[in-house]
Amino acid sequence: MAAAGEVVMLGGILLPLLLVVAVSGEPPPISRRSFPEGFIFGTASSSYQYEGGAREGGRGPSIWDTFTHQHPDKIADKSNGDVAADSYHLYKEDVRIMKDMGVDAYRFSISWTRILPNGSLSGGINREGISYYNNLINELLLKGVQPFVTLFHWDSPQALEDKYNGFLSPNIINDYKEYAETCFKEFGDRVKHWITFNEPLSFCVAGYASGGMFAPGRCSPWEGNCSAGDSGREPYTACHHQLLAHAETVRLYKEKYQVLQKGKIGITLVSNWFVPFSRSKSNIDAARRALDFMLGWFMDPLIRGEYPLSMRELVRNRLPQFTKEQSELIKGSFDFIGLNYYTSNYAGSLPPSNGLNNSYSTDARANLTAVRNGIPIGPQAASPWLYIYPQGFRELVLYVKENYGNPTIYITENGVDEFNNKTLPLQEALKDDTRIDYYHKHLLSLLSAIRDGANVKGYFAWSLLDNFEWSNGYTVRFGINFVDYNDGAKRYPKMSAHWFKEFLQK
């Protein structure tokens, strides 16, 4: 696997592409026409990061409302998503921007508490929330943009957190399923692509381990400033319940709605690519374990009905088990896989822990770093975790192809950030050459994987707009369009938006 991490990624189609870059200093040209006929290009967003209108239109509080207001110290600039990019009021402007760019599709998420303010169907449906999403969906279709709808992008109802600890309880499976069915009933005549969960890994690890940097902010006391939690058990429990809720919801959709509505349903996962720190067997094994704990945690159940062997051996009784019926239900429970890729790491082997302070962050016995022998794996972006490594994109996509039966894939997020430099004049802030270079090289890498047989059907850039970036608040900007938070969230196209418009011309 050292060879796979360091040599194979230069093989096949990618080698001549990289040679062109090396010789000329510029990547070869690429456009929509480089990709297969019918390939979908879009941009992506999420409700809490974009909408604002936190207390408008009958919306109930989510765990992110509670988290940002009770723990502003956990957000880099002590901000929140009360207003965010104000898409609750400016959605027509956003759709106009997309139409002008020429995108095919828009991936957005529905705020659970805008539909069911109390989290459960028994608490009543909020018709104002239904109207907002109907208006957004209809506006998209009017302008020729397909809606790709995520049902859960981390903003679970605070009412269910208070009632039974949210995703730590199996009770959430039925409440989630009823919420999803409400969406199928209300929007499924027009929505043809559903995503049950966005990045379960990020929600479960950052919310229940890793110092509790995401809502609901739980972790073991020795791992961070958390009021409660167990970093060695709760991440696995929460994600187990997400997988079960996913499987139950997919069965419901396929049995009751798919034939009539003619839609597809899947789940979005995130993974880095991992390059062995050296060619030693221990480091090659560590890179594989890192993939198991980030991607296999979900792909193995979806394909094989059980967690990866490495997880079962290392996590042992802290890892929940599927019953035989659950295993059969989850196996194959998707029409497509959404895959998010941003960055890569080196992986080195770690000795077994002492068994006292168990945590997801050490269970894989892999030391993840972006620097080897003083040299970073690639240029660093604004976020401390994001190093630019386009080759890893190809490697990850081909790894899914080769290890999980070449499923239909949509790249549901890919992007890079810059610092929010408030001293820059607007015209300077719109110059984002690094982002253009990032997208250009990552699209070349993806195209190489497609030409090597990966069944990828679409690509969504993260993100359409600058937005609330979770624990980073507004200190970084991921958008291809600039949002002026000091002037009514006015939108201005960055250079990357112009680049994409040219790229997308048919």
Swiss-Prot record:
EC number of the protein: 3.2.1.21
Swiss-Prot/TrEMBL catalytic activity: Hydrolysis of terminal, non-reducing beta-D-glucosyl residues with release of beta-D-glucose
UniProt keywords, alphabetically: Disulfide bond, Glycoprotein, Glycosidase, Hydrolase, Signal
Catalytic-site annotation from UniProt: 199 (proton donor), 413 (nucleophile)
Residues reported in the UniProt entry to bind a beta-D-glucoside: 49, 153, 198-199, 342, 413, 462, 469-470, 478
UniProt superkingdom: Eukaryota
Gene Ontology molecular-function annotations: beta-D-fucosidase activity; beta-galactosidase activity; beta-glucosidase activity
InterPro entries: Glyco_hydro_1 (IPR001360), Glyco_hydro_1_N_CS (IPR033132), Glycoside_hydrolase_SF (IPR017853)
Coiled coil: none
Signal peptide: 1-25
Record-level GO BP terms: carbohydrate metabolic process
Stored Pfam families: Glyco_hydro_1
Residues annotated as glycosylated: 118, 225, 357, 367, 421
Keyword field contains Signal: yes
Covalent S-S links between cysteines: 219-226
Keyword set includes Glycoprotein: yes
Family the UniProt entry places it in: Belongs to the glycosyl hydrolase 1 family.
Protein name: Beta-glucosidase 13
Taxonomic lineage: Eukaryota, Viridiplantae, Streptophyta, Embryophyta, Tracheophyta
